[in-house]
């Protein structure tokens, strides 16, 4: 859930993008009305995001609980052999020193407040009293642990880092913002091409519009969209989520662009031409508005996940624990306010419309959906730019967490405390950041003048909230895994 909040926060609040000029107006004038496969319209989302969600999310993500993210940036690429690394200085990530991270986040001895520990002990006593037979052999206990581990992994939508690995380090997201790094060209295209061509249910015979790695077939994209509309709603939704995630990344790159550099300072700001190149209807042969509409679709998914997870966070045993009691209490209060606001949205995405019908076919489709998104999360370890890899892992983890919340076989409300903790581990933070960034993307002053990245911030919050930082967690399994790099036209 932390991940959800982090990501939602990052999507929602990270950057203001001033897009003056006729081309920018054209970009947004085309993004109106009802979204495909949804009962919601763009205007309702804009109003709700800018007025109700954005201010709370922005404040929440600046807190210590959400700004520190533990990640392993040294995993090898599982799909191809490539030992090259980005040599650009803006690709570097500065990890935190041990004394910069609050003790409550990094030390297991600080994970539980006195109240939460007492509540957890009472729950454990009740469980023991109700147990039929508490004596298990070592072999049986090991088998049960392996079974539970397999069960947890089979329920995930993304791959997660091992937080206990010596390679995992805390990163301050505020000091390592997502922005343009100079990472582009063939290597960045290779990442996105692998995602779109091999992990979006698309046959190679169907050409994706504006793909720089494909030969020019003269297709104006109509063939691709005929194929897309012929898909089942679940696979169509999958493509739109990936496209929306890609759009959010490119909005960030355009919003935080290195405009000038000298011996004394670096000037970061909005690069209007970069934004237009990616989203203007004329410059993208009609693709730009579609990308922006997919960003709104992604926002609805993240928002619905935050609303659905509310019952868990209302439990008295749940704490956002950093060791700073007053601040922790304030953060939990603010988080609950945010989740209640999310729940109040009048036109939520109806997740029950997906994976419906024949149960056997629906289960097979969901498993394909899950495995394909897991693959995409693994591709993040192939990104050579470490700054891009950081934000890629965070955002895929945030979206993966949102999907788990919406489509897991286990109902959130029915989970006992310990199982709940496993959902709330690393994934929670990512989702929150993801939502935050997405919301920033959508937070536009006067609708056209300023574009803010909102989806990523929500993802960050979701990831963080599901991270191993929840106070009540006595037997928590590690979960972590989200994209940000050069755009494939």
From Swiss-Prot:
List glycan-bearing residues: 271, 375
Q: Which residues bind FAD?
A: 179, 181, 192, 243, 246, 278, 291
Q: How does it sit in the membrane?
A: Peripheral membrane protein
Recorded GO cellular component terms are: endoplasmic reticulum membrane
Q: What is its main location?
A: endoplasmic reticulum
Give the intrachain disulfide bonds.
Answer: 27-40, 29-38, 77-382, 86-91, 86-123, 91-96, 200-232, 385-388
**Cofactor(s) the record lists:** FAD
Q: How is its activity regulated?
A: Enzyme activity is tightly regulated to prevent the accumulation of reactive oxygen species in the endoplasmic reticulum. Reversibly down-regulated by the formation of disulfide bonds between the active site Cys-86 and Cys-123, and between Cys-91 and Cys-96. Glutathione may be required to regulate its activity in the endoplasmic reticulum.
PTM per Swiss-Prot/TrEMBL: The Cys-86/Cys-91 and Cys-385/Cys-388 disulfide bonds constitute the redox-active center. The Cys-86/Cys-91 disulfide bond may accept electron from protein disulfide isomerase (PDI) and funnel them to the active site disulfide Cys-385/Cys-388.
The UniProt record lists the EC number as 1.8.4.-
Record bears the keyword Isomerase: no
Q: Which GO terms describe its molecular function?
A: FAD binding; protein-disulfide reductase activity; thiol oxidase activity
Q: Where in the cell is it found?
A: Endoplasmic reticulum membrane
Question: What are the entry keywords?
Answer: Disulfide bond, Electron transport, Endoplasmic reticulum, FAD, Flavoprotein, Glycoprotein, Membrane, Oxidoreductase, Redox-active center, Signal, Transport
* Annotated signal sequence range: 1-20
Q: What does this protein do?
A: Oxidoreductase involved in disulfide bond formation in the endoplasmic reticulum. Efficiently reoxidizes P4HB/PDI, the enzyme catalyzing protein disulfide formation, in order to allow P4HB to sustain additional rounds of disulfide formation. Following P4HB reoxidation, passes its electrons to molecular oxygen via FAD, leading to the production of reactive oxygen species (ROS) in the cell. Required for the folding of immunoglobulins.
Assembly and oligomerization = Predominantly monomer. May function both as a monomer and a homodimer.
| Annotated family | Belongs to the EROs family.
Q: What is this protein called?
A: ERO1-like protein alpha
Question: Lineage of the source organism?
Answer: Eukaryota, Metazoa, Chordata, Craniata, Vertebrata
